[in-house]
Amino acid sequence: MKPLIELNNISYKYKNKKILKDINLKINEGEKIALIGKSGAGKTTLISILNGMKKQTNGDVKIYSKSFNNLDNSQKSKIGTIWQDLRLIDDLSAEQNVNCGLLCNQNLIFTLKNLLNISSFLKAHKCMDLCQLHSSIYSKNLKNISGGQKQRIAISRSIIQEPEILFADEPFNNLDPKLCNYLKNLFI
């Protein structure tokens, strides 16, 4: 069986400081793994390398048996990420933020017309419902909602893509234990 993701001798330096050194890992289709380490150990950096946001100093990342740089847009669109720092746009509504994940996934030009597409709103609402977000916040500006709601909006934005590969960087850190367990069960 060919691995879905393969890391060969991945290293990363930042300002001459080694953040990652000679990481080797193979993940087969259907497998779920967790990266566990202390704060500052490089977990977020590794996820940033895996999804193409950062370039490793040394080594090779293969996804679908190809170096990341050789993936086509269709393959890259099958990769989603939930970030610990959320990366939401405060001036947009909850549903518009969720739709951003769908629009970026399809390499569409980011326009107000695309954000107001009815079918994408319906899909966004399904994802937000799945993450137990009440319909009363769909059209609310992010400045007016809680941290836990923002966390679930970020999760909704990632799952709207229907990714085959989902990287999650502390995706439940702003949630109460009940919601955390509910969402963990969705992903496991």
List where the protein language model places each region:
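The feature captures the beta-strand-to-loop junction immediately N-terminal to the Walker
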Residues: 36-38
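Helix-to-loop junction immediately C-terminal to a conserved catalytic motif
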Residues: 51
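ABC ATPase NBD coupling module
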Residues: 67-83, 117
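Conserved ABC ATPase "signature" region
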Residues: 115-137
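Conserved ABC ATPase signature
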Residues: 141-145, 149
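Conserved catalytic motifs of ABC-family nucleotide-binding domains
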Residues: 162
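Catalytic Walker B motif of ABC-type/P-loop ATPase nucleotide-binding domains
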Residues: 166-169
